[in-house]
Amino acid sequence: MYTVFIIVPIFFAMFISLHEWSGLGEMKFTGLENFRVLLTDSRISPTFFHALKNNIKYMVVVLVIITPIQFGLAYLLYIKIKGHKYYRFMLFLPYVISTTIVSFFATILFDPNIGFMNKMLTSVGLEKSSWFGNPKLAFTLMVIVIMWQGIGTGMMIFYANMQDIPDSVIEASMIDGCNDWQRLYKIVIPLSIPSCATNIIMSTIWALGIFDLPYILGGATGGVNNSLDFVNMVFYRYTFGSALNGQSNMGFGSAISVVMFFIIFTVSMIQNRLLSKVEYEY
């Protein structure tokens, strides 16, 4: 099954990337031309690299900001703060809501004409904002929406790992007089390295492959000044014909997917190699 659903599609995409093909009819072999156009053509490569830059920027935000927040929330649940069961439910709930529904409510909330946020601004005498129509705000707002929806997933991975910490270790720390913060730094963090590695690799793959939410919020073109443009949206436009002479080109789209496959594979392997060398003691 792994071969059928993973290995075969990868090699088939590599094969198609060497051809010009609309998805129907005969394939025309073009060699590495699709890759040359993608990486060096002045009409297309700036769009691709701008989208890749957005992916990388989003990946950094996820790893540097969102992941530590997820860990912190997981620890608060682990030490059973007051109402921890309620918070656990509320933090994880957005993840089970459809991305389409989340995006719909986000567009209503930040609508420049009828949105709640602009009503709040005008009620205190401030000017309305175009929000997602403002290229300086759009990316930040998208990150906030994604964080609200997805923060519970990484949090639950960390929390599940913390639940596996042996009771004997915790009891020994209590006998030694450790408070919650000392227990965090000397026991919980070292023993959470495996789940941290899982979260980092999963978040990286997710960030470099994001599509649905920015597509709904900014449209297929990536919003104003391509502020919400990501590589998978570039793939969508060029593969299905809205940006490449109005014609579908599965070969060019496959070239984009092959490039991204090697980027994601390389980054994930480097992360896995570095994280596997981290030793922890308690």
Residue ranges and their predicted role:
Residues 1-282:
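A structural signal for multi-pass alpha-helical bundles of membrane permease subunits
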